C-alpha cells in the first residue's frame, strides 16, 4: 500500500511517497515530475553497495543520464571538504540548472546533498531517498540542509526543499540496530511534541529496541504519522519563523553533546534522546510539566534502548558554553523547546542557567 503525504508550501509543494519496493519506482516518480535528464546520485559506500545499482537501474530505465558519487559515512565527514568533492563531480559531469542531485542514504548524505544542490549554480533540484529511520521521519523532510563547522553542528546551511521524498520501508531491513534506535528517538519526539496518539501507540508496544521486534503495521504507522507530523509543522512554518522551532525538542542540549564528543561517541538520535531527558526535567523544574509525564517519556526512551544519561567525561560547563554557539540562540538567549503535556510543547528563552546546570549534574 502506498501512502502519499503532501508538504504544502507557498513556493514549491512536494510529496512524501511511502511504499514497499519504492526504490524501484524512483526513475518513474522523477520522470513524472518532468525533471531534467542529468542526475547525480550521492551515497556512501555501504548504502551504495546495497542499493546503488537498483537506484541507477530505475533511473536509467526512465531515461535519465546518471553519474554517481560516494562520500565517507559519518557526521565527522559532514563538512565543506565533502561538499567540495560533490562540486567537483558536478563540474566533471556538467550538471546544469535542470539537473537533479539524488540523496540515497541517511541524514548525513541527505544534508550534504541538499546543501550542494542548494548552492550549485545557485540551486538545482534535489530528491531525497532516505535509507535510515531517522532520515525517513525527520531530516529528509522540510528542506533543511547543511554541514558542520568545527565549532558547531549545522552552522553552515540553507533551506532547499526537495522535489520528492521517496521512502521504501524495505530498506530498513539492512539498518543496523543502533541506527534503528537512533531513528526511534525522533519518532518519540513527535509523540511528545505533536501526536499523543503516536506516543500511546509506542507505549503499548512491548519492544521498540530492534526492528525485528516491531510489527510491520506499527512501522507503517510510525512512518506515516511521523512524516505527517513533520509535513504539518513545515507546511505551517517553512523557515522556522515560529512553530517549526518545536521540531528542535531535545536538539539544543543534544547538539552540544554531539559536538563536544566529536560526533564519535554518540550518534544524533542518542544525543537527541539525552537532550529530551534534559528538556523534560528542565520543564519539571520550571513547573511546566508533570513529573509522571517526564517519567513516561524517559521510560519510552529506555525501552527503545537509547541513553538517558550524559556520556561519562563530558564537562557540564563545556555543554553550557556550547549552548551559546547553537544557531537557535537569539539576542544571546538560548531557546528551549519544553513540554507542557504529552503532545504539546512551548518554546522559551527564559531558562536560568543554574536550572540547566542542576539538571545536567543530575544526569
Curated annotation (Swiss-Prot):
Question: Into which EC class is this enzyme placed?
Answer: lyase
User: Where mainly located?
Assistant: cytoplasm
Q: In which pathway does it act?
A: Metabolic intermediate biosynthesis; chorismate biosynthesis; chorismate from D-erythrose 4-phosphate and phosphoenolpyruvate: step 2/7
UniProt keyword list? Amino-acid biosynthesis, Aromatic amino acid biosynthesis, Cobalt, Cytoplasm, Lyase, Metal-binding, NAD, Nucleotide-binding, Zinc
Q: Kindly indicate whether the keyword Amino-acid biosynthesis belongs to this entry.
A: yes
Top-level taxon in the UniProt lineage = Bacteria
Tell me one GO molecular function of this protein. Answer: metal ion binding
Q: Name one GO biological process term.
A: aromatic amino acid family biosynthetic process
Residues that bind NAD(+): 107-111, 131-132, 144, 153
Its subcellular locations are:
Cytoplasm
Q: How, per the record, is the cofactor bound?
A: Binds 1 divalent metal cation per subunit. Can use either Co(2+) or Zn(2+).
Query: Under which EC number(s) is this enzyme classified?
Result: 4.2.3.4
What is this enzyme's catalytic activity, as reactions?
Answer: 7-phospho-2-dehydro-3-deoxy-D-arabino-heptonate = 3-dehydroquinate + phosphate
Query: Where, by residue number, does Zn(2+) bind?
Result: 186, 251, 268
Cofactors per UniProt? Co(2+); Zn(2+); NAD(+)
Give any Gene Ontology cellular component: cytoplasm
What the record says about family reads: Belongs to the sugar phosphate cyclases superfamily. Dehydroquinate synthase family.
Q: Which PANTHER family did the record assign?
A: 3-DEHYDROQUINATE SYNTHASE, 3-DEHYDROQUINATE SYNTHASE, CHLOROPLASTIC
NCBIfam families hit by this protein: aroB
Instruction: Name the job this protein performs.
Output: Catalyzes the conversion of 3-deoxy-D-arabino-heptulosonate 7-phosphate (DAHP) to dehydroquinate (DHQ).
UniProt-recorded name of the protein? 3-dehydroquinate synthase
The record lists the organism as Nostoc punctiforme (strain ATCC 29133 / PCC 73102)
